[in-house]
Amino acid sequence: MYKRQAPILPIDSEHSAIFQCLVGEQSPIRRLIITCSGGAFRDLPCEKLADVTVEQALRHPQWEMGAKITIDSSTLVNKGFEVIEAHWLFGTPVEKITVLLHPQSIVHSMVEFEDGAIKAQLGTPDMRMPISFALMYPRRATRPGERFDFMAHPQLTFAGVDRAKYPALEIACECLRRRGTAACTMNGANEVAVAAFLGRKCAWLDIVRAIEYALGRASFAAAPTLGDYAEANDEARRLAAEYLAL
């Protein structure tokens, strides 16, 4: 990318939104604001999370997605990975990346500039929009049937994320601060834990616990090679399986 000056066009809705907000801008940014639906359990009290079922976790309030990413959305692991992704795509330090709860999933992300102005990208929660943007860039696809009805969405609300309810978000941010193989370890452990949850071999809360277990015991390479990443992934999977007694 750097050698050839070739742009990377993101298709994740949040990062596509940030990219679109940055087009034509030359001034430094103050922060990136990534929005978050809150997943299947955004309205569920913390004390009830211990007993949630696979079926409940798969009922995403806004998006229709595969099982793995829907579970990641319910734990906010995916949002943590999106923070990491935003850092590497846009060169933004974690301290300048904010995550806001936005239940309507209409504002896909925002960028705040040094003068206090904020640009946002809005649209219905439909992955065809960011995908078509990436495919057609720098032009836009013609979609005559796509019309946003503001009257159908009279309220757009935002709130901070409950870090106690969703510890995975801060875990991911800490992995980004540590760099090295930390995020790889988190990813490997999460994949094993999510598969176990979907297979009804562990509880929903065990997903993040398995991640914490792996991160607390895994070896760490500060300047990893490709081989180090492969080893970190294997070790994380083994540690997660060990914690879950698989």
Predicted regions and their residues:
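Catalytic, metal-anchored helix/loop core of enzyme active sites in primary metabolism
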Residues: K3-L246
